[in-house]
Amino acid sequence: MCIRDSIDYFVAGVGSGGTFTGVAKHMTTLGAKNYIVEPQGSILNGGPIHAHATEGIGSEKWPTFLDRDLVDGIFTISDKDAFNNVKLIANKEGLLVGSSSGAALQGALELKKHIKKGVIVTIFPDGSDRYMSKQIFNYKESNDNE
C-alpha cells in the first residue's frame, strides 16, 4: 500500500472500530480528516436503530475499539445507495465488492460534495463473493430500509 503525504480525507465504515482507529491514527499524522460511514439503522450518528441490509458495518452501540477523538464526521448511507454502488463498482471498475464497500464509496462521494478539493482515501473491506447466495447484485429495497 502506498501512502502519500497529500491525503486530506479518510472515509471508512466501522464494525468493531479497529481498522478505522488504526488507519485514522496514521491519517491524522498526515493532517487528514477522518469520516465514518454507517448504514441507516446504526446509532453512531444519533439516528434510530432499525434493521439494515448493509453488512459488516453499523452498530447499536459505540464500538469498543473505536477512538471517538479520531472522528471528524459521520455519513449515514442508505442501503439503496450502498447496493447501487456495488453494481457501479462492478460495472465500471470490475471489482466485486460487498455492500459495506458500496457504502464507503457513497461516503466518499458525499464528502466530495462538501469540499472544494483534496485527496480522499477509502477502504473497500469486503468482497461480493461472500454474499452471492444473498443475491447482492439483485438487491430489492424493503419499505423499512430507505
Predicted regions and their residues:
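Terminal helix/beta-alpha structural elements that buttress the NAD(P)+-binding lobe
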Residues: I7-Y9, A32, L95, S99-L105, ...
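Conserved active-site loop/cleft motifs that coordinate metal ions or position small ligands
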Residues: L96-S99, V119-F124
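A short, charged, Gly/Pro-tolerant segment at domain boundaries
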Residues: V121-S133, F137-Y139
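Active-site/ligand-binding loops adjacent to catalytic centers
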Residues: T28-S99, H114, Q135-E146
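Conserved acidic residues
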Residues: D8-V11, D72, G118
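Short glycine/serine/threonine-rich phosphate/pyrophosphate-binding segments
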Residues: G13-A24, S100-A108, Y131
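Conserved small/polar residues in nucleotide/adenosyl-binding loops
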Residues: M1-S6
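Short beta-strand segments
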Residues: A12-G15, I36-E38, V121-P125
